Amino acid sequence: MVGNSQWQSIRKDRIGDPILIDDKTLLQMANDVRKNAYCPYSNFPVGAAILCSDGTVFTGVNVENAVNGLSICAERTAIFKAVSEGHHDFVKLAVTCKGDHCQPCGACRQVIYEHAPEIEILMGNPEGKFVRTTIRDLLPEAFSL
């Protein structure tokens, strides 16, 4: 399942082979979905796209609320959509926002780590620039029970 209907043909062509979804495509999917963000308080739209091992991609955006604690980030939206559809094996996460490159917040880092401790993360911007890292680099001392 892909969060943006324009990518349906890509999903069908590439399902089962996540290697065929390159970094630029995943970043573009994250960037394209940014327009759906609900961010009237920060005016800071963020988009995310998470690639599953079977080639399925889930997208997410930040959704704000007047009570900030009830807001959710794009990264967690994408992960929770995937998990709610039965996907648990994640390969790569792309996140985009305006500025130099977009970094996941601390809460997102913990959620990402718990669901995919080996995941690669692409932190990008609308101009196509990005930084490649891993969740272990971003959160070397993750909390665990």
Residue ranges of predicted features:
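Short beta-strand scaffold segments in enzyme catalytic cores
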Residues: 43-52
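Compact, glycine-rich, soluble single-domain proteins
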Residues: 62-77
